[in-house]
Amino acid sequence: MLQRSVFFLSDRTGITAETLGHSLLTQFDGIEWKKHYASFLDSAAKAQAVIEQINTIAEQEGQPALVFSTLLDPVMLASIRRADCVLFDFFETCLGTLEAVLQQPPARIPGRSHVLRQDASYFRRIAAIQYALNSDDGANAKILADADVIVVGVSRTGKTPVCVYLALQYGVLAANYPFTPEDMGAIQLPPLLQPLRKKLFGLTLNTSRLQSIREERYPGSHYASFAECQRELQWQNELYRQFDIPSINTTDVSIEEISASIVNRAHLERRQHGT
């Protein structure tokens, strides 16, 4: 398999460079990416150390390294450009056009996107995260009715991380409820969920994927057997069908895509701004 080295550079956390860079790299199959991360590059000495690493790796591999950057310092960027690399500069790609359109120079202050602004949206996110934790796995039935959306599914379908992401990114009050073997008699909603049917959103998985996830946690158990996973998923998916519960198969879908789909299909867009 073809291998390429790729660097993610930032003068702050590096989250933006990594997220955008990864989104681009996933469009190319058959390549093993050797990833290197350098965050908080806030001095010439740190930048020089990274440049030396880039040049060393490029020489070893006989090809330029790929570099995704959100650096704002023009002097530091100029130094990186002289390294043996192909530079993808996310900020410069857009800032020049924005400057021309807005007729205003950018501030070029690192970390502005991560500054905590204590407005209504900020406080809603904090409250939503606390709600997601308090209502995890249907733990607090008394607050379930407060949810904007209730994510349902059998064990190990990814409900908890989705709810936390919905809270963190969108400020959505997301509860989750796990279907257990005790629920799986007749095809009917558990009594607790019956009055909340309109708030439900289902997660499902391919049987082989669910078995793999469960096997990692409880190897060799009945809970992790293919037959049990198949039985639970068949019951769950029929429940979704009969009660017209919107759902998404998460087998090959990222948590970001799952969450965006829930926000869109459950018509929760406006709530991400605290309204």
From Swiss-Prot:
Top-level enzyme category: transferase
List of residues binding ADP: 153-160
Reaction equation(s) it catalyzes: [pyruvate, water dikinase] + ADP = [pyruvate, water dikinase]-phosphate + AMP + H(+); [pyruvate, water dikinase]-phosphate + phosphate + H(+) = [pyruvate, water dikinase] + diphosphate
Positions of transmembrane segments: none
Keyword terms: Kinase, Nucleotide-binding, Serine/threonine-protein kinase, Transferase
EC number(s) reported in the record: 2.7.11.33, 2.7.4.28
Superkingdom to which the source organism belongs: Bacteria
Molecular-function GO term, any one: phosphotransferase activity, phosphate group as acceptor
PANTHER family: PYRUVATE, PHOSPHATE DIKINASE REGULATORY PROTEIN 1, CHLOROPLASTIC (PTHR31756:SF3)
Purpose of the protein: Bifunctional serine/threonine kinase and phosphorylase involved in the regulation of the phosphoenolpyruvate synthase (PEPS) by catalyzing its phosphorylation/dephosphorylation.
UniProt record similarity statement: Belongs to the pyruvate, phosphate/water dikinase regulatory protein family. PSRP subfamily.
Protein name listed in UniProt: Putative phosphoenolpyruvate synthase regulatory protein
The organism of origin for this protein: Nitrosomonas europaea (strain ATCC 19718 / CIP 103999 / KCTC 2705 / NBRC 14298)
